[in-house]
A protein has these predicted regions:
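Extracellular Ser/Thr-rich, low-complexity/disordered mucin-like segments
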Residues: 129-146
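Surface-exposed loop/edge segments in extracytoplasmic proteins
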Residues: 87-95
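Short, solvent-exposed loop/turn segments in extracellular or other extracytoplasmic domains
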Residues: 59, 98-104
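Solvent-exposed strand-loop boundary residues in beta-sheet-rich modules
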Residues: 84-87, 121-123
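Proteolytic processing hotspots in large secreted/extracellular or virion-associated proteins
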Residues: 27-84
């Protein structure tokens, strides 16, 4: 939970697109702004909270696996931007594991607070990753032609049947 209202408003503004990530991070941790260059947010900021006390390693740090539905192989240098509410600073955390197939990221945290997933996104690979998933567009459908022909045939048959009677 973010106690600093200014930081909370800044994180919400980044999520809404009204503030840039580098401006917000630069306020408290200016040394990270260069490391954010060329990276995009893969997820909005969200709050990490331990479930049943969380899982800790032998050093007492939290081991967290995060589901990232938008994760694709077009993303490289995947990192977690973490705002520590305990230490009042942003930090970049390199995941211990990135599973593109399972769309999960595992990382180790000193404390749990708001995070956002960031990465370099290769637009050419991103375009290729959706190949075969979209329906064809601009293809004429013939079912209306057959329906129209059936209606005309039914009408002609009805007229011919009446003339015979």
């Amino acid at each position: 939970d973010v106690k600093n209202e200014e930081i909370l408003n800044d994180l919400l503004a980044v999520n809404n697109g009204t503030k840039s990530l580098t401006d917000v991070v630069g306020k408290t941790t200016p040394e990270l702004t260069d490391q954010l260059a060329g990276k995009e947010m893969v997820s909005p900021f969200f709050d990490l909270k331990p479930v049943n006390g969380g899982i800790k390693n032998e050093e007492g740090k939290y081991v967290v696996t995060i589901s990232v539905p938008s994760l694709t192989k077009a993303m490289t240098d995947v990192q977690i931007l973490h705002y520590s509410t305990v230490r009042n600073l942003f930090e970049l955390i390199t995941p211990t594991s990135v599973d593109y197939e399972g769309k999960t990221i595992t990382a180790v945290f000193e404390d749990l607070s708001p995070v956002a997933i960031i990465a370099k996104v290769d637009a050419s690979k991103a375009a290729d990753s959706t190949l075969g998933t979209s329906p064809k567009t601009g293809v004429a459908s013939t079912w209306m032609v057959f329906f129209g022909a059936a209606v005309v045939l039914a009408g002609v048959s009805a007229v011919a049947y009446r003339k015979e009677r």
